[in-house]
Swiss-Prot record:
The class A beta-lactamase family has a specific amino-acid numbering system, sometimes called Ambler or ABL numbering and often misspelt as Amber. A multiple sequence alignment was used to derive a consensus sequence and then the consensus was numbered taking into account insertions and deletions. This allows use of identical numbers, e.g. for active site residues, despite differences in protein length. UniProt always uses natural numbering of residues, hence there appear to be differences in numbering between this entry and some papers. Substrate binds at residues 237-239. PANTHER family: BETA-LACTAMASE (PTHR35333), BETA-LACTAMASE-TYPE TRANSPEPTIDASE FOLD CONTAINING PROTEIN (PTHR35333:SF3). It catalyses: a beta-lactam + H2O = a substituted beta-amino acid. GO terms for biological process: beta-lactam antibiotic catabolic process; response to antibiotic. It comes from Salmonella typhimurium. This is Beta-lactamase CTX-M-6. It comes from the Bacteria. It holds the Pfam family Beta-lactamase2. The active site is at residue 73. Its EC number is 3.5.2.6. InterPro entries: Beta-lactam/transpept-like, Beta-lactam_cat, Beta-lactam_class-A, Beta-lactam_class-A_AS. Belongs to the class-A beta-lactamase family.
Length: 291
């Protein structure tokens, strides 16, 4: 597989095609995808980053995939996975209970707010963070791990040298242009998501739990999922923040094809811009066409 740095004006498409396809055909297809993504980005008025990994042969479709984007709530996958990793050596860990106080609540707590003055297990916090994007649940996972830097350290243990988590919810969603805090690149996130859900980064039981949580996500119907055939399986985690930042990362199971891993990150120049899940759906449709 070729490796190269992807610049704004470039798209890398490395796909296994039948031998009857000529190099000219491959070039034309690559140009078509590039042109469609460039047109989508231009019409949206924002900055779009896309990374798709075809696990059948580890070929990739990359667009602005080595630029940093604010992760927002897509970072919850890493925090939940870090707790799952700990549970490999402590089979009772996910049943450990964490106290939920009114003072713990932040700006979005659809699950945690039901447990104020009570407790939640780490398993419930993982499900709440990934399936409902509960911000208090995320903060409790981070606190259990020992802080944002411990989430970053877990990423480093997986070989991800790009991911960085610096803050907790909700400040990690500020998404200020040029601010490196709480960012990664589409390609780095795609590679790590692949390792966590389809690779050996987690033991089988923990990997299955992570995939189950992602497949049960309730927040992604208008994002990547909206750009895919309804018959395909999807597990995803969305994210949103200031500057109209709109994200989704997903593992996709097409019919009769090996899984795909897709990361779509999008942000805009105005701090109060609205989210654009339609851009993510359109990008997903473009890059998965033909699978």
């Amino acid at each position: 597989m070729m490796t190269q740095s992807i610049r704004r004006s470039m798209l890398t498409v490395m796909a296994t095609l039948p031998l009857l396809f000529s190099s000219a055909t491959l070039h034309a297809q690559a140009n078509s995808v590039q042109q469609q993504l460039e047109a989508l980005e231009k019409s949206s008025g924002g900055r779009l980053g896309v990374a798709l990994i075809n696990t059948a042969d580890n070929s990739q479709i990359l667009y602005v995939a080595d630029e940093r984007f604010a992760m927002c709530s897509t970072s919850k996958v890493m925090a939940a996975a870090a707790v799952l990793k700990q549970s490999e050596s402590d089979k009772h860990l996910l049943n450990q209970r964490v106290e939920i106080r009114a003072s713990d609540l932040v700006n979005y707590n659809p699950i945690a707010e039901k447990h104020v003055n009570g407790t939640m297990t780490l398993a419930q916090l993982g499900a709440g963070a990934l399936q409902y994007s509960d911000n208090t649940a995320m903060n409790k996972l981070i606190a259990h791990l020992g802080g944002p830097d411990k989430v970053t350290a877990f990423a480093r243990s997986l070989g991800d040298e790009t991911f960085r988590l610096d803050r907790t919810e909700p400040t990690l969603n500020s998404a200020i242009p040029g601010d490196p805090r709480d960012t990664t690149t589409p390609l780095a996130m795609a590679q790590t998501l692949k390792n966590l859900t389809l690779g050996k980064a987690l033991a089988e039981t923990q990997r299955a739990q992570l995939v189950t949580w992602l497949k049960g996500n309730t927040t992604g119907s208008a994002s990547i999922r909206a750009g895919l055939p309804k018959s395909w399986g999807v597990g995803d985690k969305t994210g949103s923040g200031d500057y109209g930042t709109t994200n989704d990362i997903a593992v996709i199971w097409p019919e009769n094809h090996a899984p795909l891993v897709l990361v779509t990150y999008f942000t805009q120049p105005e701090q109060k811009a609205e989210s654009r899940r339609d851009v993510l759906a359109a990008a997903a449709k473009i890059v998965t066409h033909g699978f």
